[in-house]
Curated annotation (Swiss-Prot):
Keyword Nucleotide-binding part of the UniProt annotation: no
Subunit structure and binding partners: F-type ATPases have 2 components, F(1) - the catalytic core - and F(0) - the membrane proton channel. F(1) has five subunits: alpha(3), beta(3), gamma(1), delta(1), epsilon(1). F(0) has three main subunits: a(1), b(2) and c(10-14). The alpha and beta chains form an alternating ring which encloses part of the gamma chain. F(1) is attached to F(0) by a central stalk formed by the gamma and epsilon chains, while a peripheral stalk is formed by the delta and b chains.
Source species: Corynebacterium jeikeium (strain K411)
Transmembrane segments: 28-48
Gene3D superfamilies: F1F0 ATP synthase subunit B, membrane domain
Name of protein: ATP synthase subunit b
Length: 186
């Protein structure tokens, strides 16, 4: 089979051999005419539409970029506003906390003052009650001592002391003497 191809190749004359890369002239002419028509149609109708679509696309992309930039700027402004509000809220919270602390200290001081006043009042009331009880006890003791001394004096003297004025004078003199002795002994 190889021999057949070789024999077929030898029979062709050399000058008639055609270059497969360069087509004949009539093919080139008839190829240029439809190419020019297609190029004209493409140039006149397709390319403007294509350019219009590309321009719309470009406008959409640029508009999207502008919208994204404006949205980013708005977001940044909102973030700054939020941070400012947060800082203001923290400052206000610190001020409220300080006010509450000072009010708490004031309330504590007021309560201590009230407690001190109440304590002093209770102590004073206690002193008054003790003084009243002491006076009552002293009065009762004087009365009992007076009666006991009269009974003792009647036993010693062997007679009854009948005069109440005399009795009370004797008792008062005796108790005054005891008070003087008690006061000088202190």
């Amino acid at each position: 089979m190889t021999n057949t191809f070789l024999l077929a190749a030898e029979k062709l004359p050399m000058e008639e051999s055609v270059n497969p890369l360069i087509p004949p002239l009539y093919d080139i002419v008839w190829s240029i005419i439809p190419f020019a028509v297609i190029l004209f149609v493409f140039w006149k109708f397709v390319l403007p539409k294509f350019q219009e679509v590309l321009n719309q696309r470009e406008d959409q992309i640029e508009g999207g970029i502008r919208r994204a930039e404006s949205a980013q700027a708005e977001a940044k402004a909102a973030l700054e506003k939020y941070n400012a509000q947060l800082a203001e809220a923290r400052t206000e919270a610190a001020q409220i906390r300080d006010d509450a602390r000072s009010q708490g200290q004031k309330i504590i001081a007021d309560m201590k003052a009230q407690a001190t006043e109440e304590s002093n009042r209770i102590v004073e009331s206690g002193h008054k009650q003790l003084e009243a009880q002491r006076s009552a006890v002293v009065t009762d003791l004087r009365k009992e001592m007076g009666e006991n001394s009269i009974n003792l004096a009647e036993r010693l003297l062997g007679e009854q002391l009948s005069d109440d004025v005399k009795r009370s004078g004797t008792i008062d003199n005796f108790l005054a003497g005891l008070d003087n002795v008690g006061a000088s002994g202190k």
